[in-house]
Structures are given as C-alpha cells and as structure tokens.
C-alpha cells in the first residue's frame, strides 16, 4: 500500500464550505503516481504505458479545507492487461471517500491493450489488498 498526505487547498472548497467533489479525482490521480512509476519510472509522457478505463468515487463523509487528508492506495484486482487501484481518503482518521480506478496496460502505437508482464504483475502484487 502507498500512502500520500495532502493539504486541501482553499480553491478546492465550494459554496457549502467543504471540499468540492471534483477535487477527489485529481487527488486520486496524484496518489496513483507510485503505481505509474512501475510502468514509466521517469514519468515521461512519451513513454507512457497506461490508460484509465474507469474511475469511481463513493463519498462517505465531508472533507474540509485546511485539515490534512491521507490517501491510501492499494491494488484490489489484477487481470491480464488491467488492474484496479483502490483508494481511501481519510481526514481525522475518518474514512471520507473510496475510489476505484481501472488502469489498462496500453500500446499507444498499436492503439491496443497489452498483457501485463510478470515483473509488472509482481510489483502490483506487492500492494495487493483483498477488498
């Protein structure tokens, strides 16, 4: 599991005084960076090997500006050419949101998915957490 700590920005609040729902997918993407490095260690977009096939966010509670959040990211499924990253957002040790991102190993030249190799699967398995 990877863990990332972020401080919500004022610009991420809405008229109701809590963090806007549009902020979480951005936070989740930032917290997926360690997984991206398995496929593109230098994060060079010209060598990118992943696409997002699906994202989901389930809100469990409110999140507030100026109060640190923690995002825990783990792998919940590994397929032939895809895997699912499960992400949980905590504020004050309370679970506030859960996200899932289905990532696909992709060849941009062929415009097709590619099977995960054994090394990639092994790296992902190190962060596997059954849901």
Regions found by a protein language model. Give the residues of each.
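HotDog/MaoC-like acyl-thioester-processing domains
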Residues: 1-3, 64-65, 76-131
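Hydrophobic beta-strand-centered segment that forms part of the acyl-chain substrate-binding groove
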Residues: 35-83, 96-97, 104
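Hot-dog-fold acyl-thioester-processing enzymes
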Residues: 1-54, 108-131
């Amino acid at each position: 599991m990877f863990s990332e700590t972020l401080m919500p920005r004022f610009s991420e609040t809405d008229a109701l005084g809590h963090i806007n729902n549009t902020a979480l997918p951005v936070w989740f993407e930032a917290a997926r960076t360690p997984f991206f490095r398995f496929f593109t260690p230098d994060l060079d977009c010209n060598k990118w090997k992943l696409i997002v096939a699906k994202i989901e966010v389930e809100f469990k509670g409110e999140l507030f500006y100026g109060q640190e959040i923690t995002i825990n990211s783990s792998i919940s499924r590994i397929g032939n050419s895809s895997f699912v990253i499960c992400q949980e957002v905590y504020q004050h040790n309370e679970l506030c949101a859960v996200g899932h991102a289905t990532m696909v190993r992709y060849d941009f030249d062929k415009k097709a998915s590619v099977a995960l190799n054994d090394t990639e699967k092994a790296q992902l398995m190190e962060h596997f957490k059954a849901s």
